[in-house]
Amino acid sequence: LLADIEAATSEIYLESYIYADDEIGHAVTSALCHAAERGVSVHVLVDGFGARNFEQDFMPRLLAAGAHVMAYRREFARFRLRRHRLRRLHRKLVVIDSRLAFVGGINIVDDNNAPEGMRPRFDYAVRLEGPVLRQVHHAVRHMWEIVSWASLKRRFRQARMAPAGDTAVGTQAAAFLIRDNIRHRNDILHAYVHAAG
């Protein structure tokens, strides 16, 4: 991920539920800042609960470098019970230059740095290229638009980027599915059942 961020030339979208103040968080932030400083359009979207310290730990540095940064459903009253609090941004996505993406369960956190007595977390992500990138790219840009509007922030004007190509890369088949608790609750399950025949 870090090498691909450093190689970016036009745009980066990063979405994460957790963005920790640890070695990984600082390394990713440094790479994103370097990209923004060299003119790459950097968009970082984190969850307002899962990454609740992001705004004080990393946001000033990213903004100073020229990155666009937002939090999804920021938590102002942590101990207040409201139904909307259950709706979080659990996606872990990175799209770089409309040419590659990382999709999976890996947050921006050092998974091996577990508190005393706890096992480290093991999660996975895949690096994607090829036609499936169109869907991933559309998903991150669409979420950015929604959160920009919902936050009543000045909508960051997004430059039109060349769409991902239709040329297959490798021999694996891939699909990108979005799951949430309302409209797409069972999409992934249905895709597994369909793929299994």
Q: Predicted regions span which residues?
A:
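Charged, low-complexity intrinsically disordered terminal segments
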Residues: 1-197
